[in-house]
UniProtKB/Swiss-Prot annotation:
Protein name: Probable endonuclease LCL3
Catalytic residue list: R151, E159, R199
Molecular-function GO term, any one: endonuclease activity
Gene3D superfamilies, per the entry: 2.40.50.90
Location relative to the cell: Mitochondrion; Membrane
Chief localization: mitochondrion
Gene: LCL3
Protein's organism: Saccharomyces cerevisiae (strain Lalvin EC1118 / Prise de mousse) (Baker's yeast)
PANTHER family: EBNA2 BINDING PROTEIN P100, SERINE_THREONINE-PROTEIN KINASE 31
Recorded superkingdom: Eukaryota
EC number: 3.1.-.-
Length: 274
């Protein structure tokens, strides 16, 4: 083979190799940006994700009965989380929820009516509360992390004490239940919209070893710790409104959780009143 032909072949090989390397690099960049980029705040989530895709991550903080903070971990272990990319470590609580919000359990009912029915109702309410207050909250909330605030779709949990306003009955119990169920655990989140507080309204799914995949909003309704969302703005059900209303009806008919009360003010009514 002549020297000129040999040089031409080498040049062609180099060109092909360069094209392959360039193509591979561009593919890797595209794959990373599309599938492995971490969303660190609500506004980072692309519009193409809403209503169509699920995000995987860890719950690092639960501050209320129907919302929490979500640390996005795209790709999971295959995306490098836990061996190439650090995952926030939770701090063990070392305390039960009963100690953390003992004020809820020890709440005094100032009722001077000694009629047996009244005393029986009060006892039933305390008993209903106690089953939630005894739940273990294994971790403390982690703050100051790049997380997305998530608002559970389709439901409203009883309000806790805010800005000097009193808490609703079962407000603390709903918080404890949610902390027990998801704090420090991995969940899947399906973004649906963004509300007026810049929270991502989403359907949330988590794995239960005894029952498989669970819809978090639905589980709260089943246990009587939330009602179907009543608002007219940012109303999101992800095509599950009928199912949510059915299980709310079951919880109400069985007097589970907050439905044990004879007189009940919904979270929506409470917010309008104050």
């Amino acid at each position: 083979m002549r020297e000129g032909d040999s040089n031409s072949k080498k040049s062609a090989d180099v060109a092909v190799l360069s094209i392959i390397l360039t193509g591979s690099t561009l593919t890797l960049i595209y794959t990373y940006k599309r599938y492995l980029t971490q969303f660190k705040r609500t506004n980072d989530i692309p519009r193409r994700i809403f209503r169509k895709h699920w995000l995987y991550g860890k719950v690092t903080s639960v501050g209320d009965g129907d919302n929490f903070h979500f640390f996005h971990m795209p790709g999971g272990i295959r995306g490098g989380w836990g061996w190439l990319r650090p995952v926030p470590q939770m701090i063990k609580n070392g305390s039960t929820a009963e100690k953390l919000v003992g004020d809820s359990r020890n709440m005094r009912f100032f009722n001077f009516n000694w009629i047996t029915h009244g005393r029986s109702t009060k006892s039933k309410i305390q008993k209903a509360k106690s089953q939630f207050l005894k739940l273990n909250v294994p971790y403390k909330n982690r703050k100051n992390l790049p997380t997305i605030p998530i608002r559970l779709c389709g439901i409203d949990a009883p309000e806790r004490a805010h800005f000097g306003n009193p808490a609703q009955p079962f407000g603390n119990e709903a918080l404890i239940w949610l902390q027990n169920r998801i704090l420090g655990k991995k969940v899947w989140v399906k973004p649906l919209s963004i509300d007026q507080y810049n929270r991502c309204v989403a359907r949330v799914s988590y794995w239960d070893w005894f029952g498989g995949w669970k819809d978090l909003s639905l589980e709260m309704l089943k246990d009587g710790l939330a009602v179907v969302y009543e608002g007219k703005v940012n109303t999101e059900f992800d095509d599950r409104e009928d199912k949510y209303r059915y299980y709310e009806f079951l919880a109400r008919s069985r007097k589970k959780g907050l439905w044990i009360q004879n007189k009940f003010e919904t979270p929506g009514e409470y917010k309008k009143r104050i």
